[in-house]
């Protein structure tokens, strides 16, 4: 069952000093006397009675201070969107209730105004009452506006969620808000009227300019019209002449074509007679050509038969010639075999002589060689040393192989590391390109930092979106949703001095919009979570946010300090399904489920938990993971491999040199062994060689060749082959004689065939020439016949056309009036066309003329007169606008300048008391552009900087809060509004500035001439200066508090004074 919460104290009389004895406090008309809330946000029932001057509403976070601000805004016809909390008014009703109520009582003479708003949750609508009577929203808005209450003006009403928007207001918006807030009622009206009149003046000037241009063009057209009237009549005369020429031209054309027809008809008849004669002459030639072709074909048949016979005889001759060549080849082979026998015998004798000579030489050497001493000890010694050298070489070869294998492995590993580092570098490059595309100023600052790191005393970390590496891409959305975009692109410093140097250079000098933060002096990166993650596993949590990513130590320290990433657990869908149990059983302030983020706040008094949730947006910057530990390990491994490779190269060089030395020694020992072995076996070798050589001589002497016998056998074989050749020659001569006689016969037939072919070609040429002439004659006849037909049709068409041009019937003769008119005109087509072109050229000079030109001319003159009168009226109206603008500008600008001077005086004084500098001035780009006027606020908080315009980006949050408060205070004494509301403006201020600002608040808001002020704050510094005109409203709530109507304030004050006296004793 839900525990109901009520505001337990009224603060209207809770002051440090009772002021009833001084008379009733003065109230400004429209100031708030009472605020009543029922089922509104955190309250069941609550009534607040503020004082007429400064009201300090104090209470812990979650007690309902801002709920009072929301009630003021919504109760005075404000829109929910202005509060920056929710778009629907129904969402401001307490959860579980169907309707809520807000009632505001405003001071007014003679009777206060009570505005009531009842909110329906189901329909999201509101019912309005004024002084308990039903009314409309428009009536409420008019009543509120009549009291100069502007809850949509940030200069008057500044909710907690809209504090940042004040700094984001443009100069133009700030001027309009200030005019509405403290200017006389007519000031903003004059400003709006000036803008409207200036816009109308521009429009009227453009209209006048357009009309003057139109008048000039119309005058030029009217002048042309006068000339066109005279030219019209002259043009008409030329047109009549063109019409008569066009009537005569078809008759002349008809006569020309008729004459052509007669001429073509005569030529066609002549061509027909010529064609008949040519056909009669061509018949004999055809007969002669046919006879020649028959004789020519019979000769070709005889030539072919003779050629076949010649081919057969030629083949027989070739066969006999091949047989003769074969016999010649057999004789050559017999002679070649005989020569080879002779050469073989000569070679045998030479080998025998050479063998005897070598035997003599070896015998001589054998006589000189004696038995050598025993060489075995020397050979054994050489063998032992050679074996030792070979073993050492084998060992070195093995070592070289091992070293080479190790080098190859190390080089392969180095290549793998280089590839992996390249992949990591590519990921870093992609992240930098994303930074450049989204935040160009931050990327420019990054490039400057990398070139100027030597200027900083301590480490400077690049933007967090580059240095944070999420270990798993699917977890990137948790980190990005937890860290604001401004901090994602922020540079992280370890030294405040380094950060100021960085900001002065980039913000002030280079005008770049960059963010920077400073890590805590004491590192928080290793801070342990209050609850081990193992205890949260049962709720579906698998890790704290800090364990999901890597970051440099300063960045991690800042995130732990600012965002408590070591205390924010990340869960799964299981966590989402049991979220109510998680919130109830754990003391977590922020948690993440699979797709949502939950923020839990606990009321200080009721101990109830309030949670809000939001869907996680997809990750944009941290999708790419770069494992810095892996990169560092890879770089260290790369250095180690480099040293190992250098060492291996040295070992390899030493082993190669040793191997080369052993190889030389091995060769020397082998040569020594060879020489010793040769010295011991030379005599045996010589004796063996001599015995072998005697054996080869015996074999050579046992196989002699009988050359005479071989020669006789060769002659017998050659004689038999020659007899066969003689027979083949006789047969060949018979075939040759037959071949010659057949060729002579063939030649005679070819000569006859050639003569017949020549005669046939001559006859065909004559026939072809006759055929060409016949076809030409036939073509000429057809062309003339076709032309005659076409001319006949043309004559008929032209005659018909000529009669139509003269509006005549088909059987009517040319009237006399046309004959008379035609006599004065040219008689040939060329002359008529030339005359027509000349007249048409003249007519073409009269372009744009018509019968209505006279009427248009008079009409144009009337329009000119009307336009001139309109221009005079517009000029008069424009002068009236300029006079009105001048008068209104004087009535608006002079009071505005005085007002801004007064604001500047107060604003500068406030800043001077805070040992800072601030200015307010009227910013004008062009005096005539009233929609561009604006108020410019410039501030300076540090001696080493210049005055800078107040913007959302340049100043820190605390500096913007101080500037906003002091500007609102500067408006306070000048303000016409009945009350002003500022919600938690001291957030982000340092204690010194907060104390100074509070003292200024008290001093300014507690004057007699100032209106009511509401200052909402969750905390107050100790030992502040208070004023008896202040009203302190303490907000307490919880399930065990007394109800508001049972609170005895006097009894509480007596008890407090009694306790105070006891403390003094």
Swiss-Prot record:
Instruction: Give the matching InterPro entries.
Output: P-loop_NTPase, RecF/RecN/SMC_N
Taxonomic source organism: Gallus gallus
Q: Which GO terms describe its biological process?
A: cell division; cellular senescence; double-strand break repair via homologous recombination; positive regulation of maintenance of mitotic sister chromatid cohesion; telomere maintenance via recombination
> Quaternary state and partners of this protein?
Forms a heterodimer with SMC6. Component of the SMC5-SMC6 complex which consists at least of SMC5, SMC6, NSMCE2, NSMCE1 and NSMCE4A.
The UniProt similarity line reads: Belongs to the SMC family. SMC5 subfamily.
One GO molecular function term?
single-stranded DNA binding
Q: Does the keyword Nucleotide-binding apply?
A: yes
User: Where are the annotated coiled coils located?
Assistant: 134-156, 186-400, 628-805
Compartments in which it is found: Nucleus; Chromosome; Chromosome, Telomere
Q: Which residues bind ATP?
A: 59-66
Gene Ontology cellular component? chromosome, telomeric region; nucleus; PML body; Smc5-Smc6 complex
According to its record, what is known about the domains?
The flexible hinge domain, which separates the large intramolecular coiled coil regions, allows the heterotypic interaction with the corresponding domain of SMC6, forming a V-shaped heterodimer.
State what this protein does: Core component of the SMC5-SMC6 complex, a complex involved in repair of DNA double-strand breaks by homologous recombination. The complex may promote sister chromatid homologous recombination by recruiting the SMC1-SMC3 cohesin complex to double-strand breaks. The complex is required for telomere maintenance via recombination and mediates sumoylation of shelterin complex (telosome) components. Required for recruitment of telomeres to PML nuclear bodies. Required for sister chromatid cohesion during prometaphase and mitotic progression; the function seems to be independent of SMC6.
- Region annotation Flexible hinge: where it falls in the sequence: 441-627
What's this protein's name? Structural maintenance of chromosomes protein 5
Q: Which UniProt keywords apply?
A: ATP-binding, Cell cycle, Cell division, Chromosome, Coiled coil, DNA damage, DNA recombination, DNA repair, Mitosis, Nucleotide-binding, Nucleus, Telomere
């Amino acid at each position: 069952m839900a525990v109901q919460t009520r505001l337990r104290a009224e603060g209207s009389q809770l002051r440090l000093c009772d002021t009833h004895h001084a008379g009733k406090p003065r109230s400004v008309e429209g100031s708030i006397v009472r605020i009543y809330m029922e089922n509104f946000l955190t309250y069941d029932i609550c009534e607040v009675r503020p004082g007429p001057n400064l009201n300090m509403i104090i209470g812990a976070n979650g007690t309902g201070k801002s709920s009072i601000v929301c009630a003021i805004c919504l109760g005075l016809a404000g829109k929910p969107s202005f509060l920056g909390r929710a778009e629907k008014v129904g969402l401001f009703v307490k959860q579980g209730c169907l309707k809520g109520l807000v009632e505001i009582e405003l001071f007014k003479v003679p009777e206060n105004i009570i505005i009531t708003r009842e909110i329906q949750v189901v329909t999201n609508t509101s019912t309005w009452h004024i002084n308990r009577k039903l009314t409309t929203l428009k009536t409420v808005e008019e009543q509120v506006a009549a009291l100069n209450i502007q809850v949509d003006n940030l200069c008057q009403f500044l909710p907690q969620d809209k504090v940042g928007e004040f700094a984001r207001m443009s100069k133009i918006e700030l001027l309009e808000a200030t005019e509405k807030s403290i200017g006389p009622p007519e000031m903003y009206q004059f400003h709006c009227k000036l803008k409207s009149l200036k816009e109308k003046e521009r429009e009227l000037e453009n209209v006048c300019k357009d009309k003057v241009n139109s008048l000039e063009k119309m005058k030029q057209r009217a002048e042309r019209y006068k000339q066109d009237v005279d030219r019209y009549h002259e043009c008409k005369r030329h047109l009549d002449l063109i019409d008569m020429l066009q009537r005569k031209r078809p008759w002349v054309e008809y006569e020309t074509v008729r004459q052509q027809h007669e001429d073509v008809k005569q030529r066609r008849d002549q061509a027909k007679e010529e064609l008949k004669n040519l056909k009669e002459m061509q018949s004999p030639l055809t007969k002669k050509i046919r006879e020649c072709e028959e004789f020519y074909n019979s000769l070709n048949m005889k030539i072919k038969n003779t050629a076949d016979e010649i081919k057969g005889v030629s083949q027989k001759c070739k066969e006999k010639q091949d047989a003769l060549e074969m016999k010649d080849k057999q004789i050559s082979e017999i002679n070649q075999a005989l020569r080879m026998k002779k050469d073989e015998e000569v070679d045998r004798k030479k080998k025998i002589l050479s063998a005897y000579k070598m035997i003599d030489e070896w015998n001589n050497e054998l006589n000189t060689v004696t038995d050598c001493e025993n060489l075995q000890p020397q050979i054994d010694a050489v063998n032992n040393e050679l074996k030792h050298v070979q073993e050492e070489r084998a060992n070195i070869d093995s070592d070289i192989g091992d070293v080479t294998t190790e080098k190859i492995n190390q080089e392969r590993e180095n290549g793998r590391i280089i590839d992996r580092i390249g992949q990591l570098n590519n990921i870093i490059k992609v992240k930098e390109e994303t930074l450049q595309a989204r935040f160009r100023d931050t990327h420019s600052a990054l490039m400057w930092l990398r070139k100027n790191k030597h200027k900083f005393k301590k480490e400077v970390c690049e933007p967090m979106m580059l240095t944070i590496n999420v270990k798993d891409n699917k977890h990137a959305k948790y980190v990005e949703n937890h860290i604001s975009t401004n901090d994602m692109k922020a540079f992280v410093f370890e030294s405040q001095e380094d950060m100021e140097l960085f900001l002065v250079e980039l913000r002030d000098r280079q005008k770049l919009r960059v963010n920077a933060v400073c890590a805590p002096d004491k590192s928080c990166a290793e801070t342990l979570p209050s609850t081990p993650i193992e205890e949260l596993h049962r709720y579906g949590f698998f890790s704290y946010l800090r364990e999901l990513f890597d970051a440099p130590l300063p960045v991690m320290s800042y995130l732990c300090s600012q965002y408590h990433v070591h205390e924010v657990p990340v869960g799964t869908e299981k966590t989402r399904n049991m979220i109510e149990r998680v919130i109830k059983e754990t003391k977590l302030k922020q948690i993440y489920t699979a797709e949502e983020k939950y923020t839990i706040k606990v009321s200080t008094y009721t101990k109830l938990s309030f949670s809000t949730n939001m869907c996680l947006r997809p990750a944009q910057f941290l999708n790419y993971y770069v494992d810095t530990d892996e990169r560092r390990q890879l770089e260290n491994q790369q250095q180690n491999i480099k040293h190992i490779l250098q060492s291996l190269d040295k070992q390899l060089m030493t082993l190669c040199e040793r191997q080369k030395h052993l190889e030389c020694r091995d060769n020397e020992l082998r040569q020594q062994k060879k020489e010793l072995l040769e010295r011991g076996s030379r005599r045996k070798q010589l004796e063996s060689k001599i015995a072998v050589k005697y054996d080869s001589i015996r074999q050579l002497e046992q196989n002699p060749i009988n050359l005479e016998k071989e020669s006789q056998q060769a002659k017998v074989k050659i004689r038999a082959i020659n007899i066969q050749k003689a027979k083949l020659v006789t047969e060949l001569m018979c075939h040759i004689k037959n071949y010659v006689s057949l060729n002579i016969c063939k030649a005679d037939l070819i000569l006859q065939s050639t003569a017949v072919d020549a005669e046939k070609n001559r006859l065909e040429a004559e026939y072809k020439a006759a055929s060409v002439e016949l076809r030409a004659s036939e073509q000429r006849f057809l062309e003339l016949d076709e032309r005659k037909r076409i001319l006949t049709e043309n004559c008929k068409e032209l005659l018909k056309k000529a009669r139509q041009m003269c509006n005549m019937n088909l059987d009517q003769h040319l009237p006399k009036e046309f004959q008379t008119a035609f006599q004065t005109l040219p008689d040939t087509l060329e002359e008529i066309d030339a005359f027509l072109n000349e007249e048409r050229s003249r007519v073409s000079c009269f372009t744009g003329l018509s019968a209505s030109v006279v009427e248009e001319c008079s009409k144009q003159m009337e329009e000119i007169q009307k336009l001139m009168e309109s221009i005079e009226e517009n000029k008069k109206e424009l002068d009236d606008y300029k006079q009105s603008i001048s008068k209104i500008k004087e009535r608006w600008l002079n009071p505005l300048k005085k007002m801004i001077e007064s604001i500047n005086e107060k604003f500068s004084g406030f800043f001077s008391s805070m040992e800072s500098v601030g200015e307010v001035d009227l910013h004008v780009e062009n005096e005539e552009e009233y929609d561009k006027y604006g108020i410019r606020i410039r501030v300076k908080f540090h001696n080493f900087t210049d005055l800078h315009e107040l913007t959302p980006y340049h100043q820190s949050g605390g500096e913007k809060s101080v500037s906003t408060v002091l500007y609102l205070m500067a408006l306070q004494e000048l303000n016409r509004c009945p009350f002003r509301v500022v919600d938690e403006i001291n957030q982000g201020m340092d204690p010194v500035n907060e104390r100074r600002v509070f003292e200024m608040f008290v001093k300014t808001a507690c004057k007699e001439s100032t209106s009511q002020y509401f200052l909402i704050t969750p905390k107050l510094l100790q030992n502040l200066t208070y004023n008896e005109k202040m009203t302190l409203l303490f907000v307490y709530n919880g399930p065990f508090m007394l109800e508001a109507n049972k609170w005895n304030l006097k009894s509480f004050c007596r008890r407090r004074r009694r306790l105070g006296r006891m403390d003094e004793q």
